[in-house]
Regions:
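A short, polar/charged loop-to-alpha-helix boundary motif
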Residues: 66-85
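Rhodanese-like catalytic fold shared by cysteine-dependent sulfurtransferases
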Residues: 87-98, 102-124, 134-138, 145-174, ...
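Mid-to-C-terminal Rossmann-like scaffold of FAD/NAD(P)H-dependent oxidoreductases
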Residues: 1-67, 102, 106-132, 138
Length: 215
């Protein structure tokens, strides 16, 4: 589907249909570059993957963005048709040139983000969970490149070399950045330094509505 300034494509089951069909579902919403970020016209894909939690088989793909969403969904069609699992998709070496894609294909990036979530490396909440106020009671950490969230504590992930000042290790922490990449990196650092209750908001500020109430 082509909309003004935005293309949309999907294949397979969406989350609701997969649950209705009896699958134990896991999903992820990933925002990543649609081509080399420095190339003129570079933008982002917003990709949602739906998988069977028990088998890791791909069930559905939905993609939004101004670029070639059809290519993303074509990969999904092939994977679903062949009954492929995430483990079979995580290392696909797809065509690359800066005008057309990223060195690690955006589809493969989304697959690896979902694998990180299923393996417990990424602890996150989906945009739907965020909209349902699942983040109530969490302290907001802003992990963007520059302060972007009113009233939130800004943390530069590159400068985190130990526990954060004024942040307890058992405090409930909701980490947000522009596209969730820096938030994931900050989460890993905080885990290393003993923080026990962190969650990343999938899709980041790119997909989720502001303002966010900080603490």
């Amino acid at each position: 589907m082509k909309l003004p300034g935005l293309n949309a494509a999907r294949t397979g089951l969406n989350e609701a249909a997969a649950r209705a069909a009896g699958y134990d579902v896991e999903t992820v919403v990933a925002v990543n570059d649609d081509k080399a970020h420095y190339y003129p016209g570079a933008d982002n894909f917003i990709t949602k993957l739906v998988v069977d939690k028990n088998t890791k088989k791909l069930l559905g793909v939905q993609v939004l963005g101004p670029g070639a969403v059809d290519k993303m969904v074509d990969i999904g069609v092939t994977a679903i048709s062949l009954g492929a699992t995430l483990d079979q998709l995580e290392n696909m070496d797809l065509a690359y040139a800066p005008p057309f894609s990223t060195a690690i294909h955006p589809f493969v990036v989304a697959v690896n983000i979902l694998l990180n979530k299923m393996n417990g490396d990424l602890e996150s909440m989906t945009p739907a969970e965020y909209m349902e106020n699942r983040g109530e009671g969490y302290r907001v950490l802003d992990a963007a490149q520059a302060p972007s969230i009113p009233n939130a504590k800004f943390v530069d992930v590159a400068k985190v070399h130990g526990p954060l000042e004024d942040v307890d290790k058992d405090e409930k922490l909701m980490i947000i950045c522009t596209k969730s990449k820096r938030a994931y990196m900050l989460q890993q650092r905080l885990k290393y330094f003993g923080y026990t209750d962190t969650t990343v908001v999938e899709g980041g500020l790119w997909f989720n509505e502001l303002p966010v109430k900080g603490k």
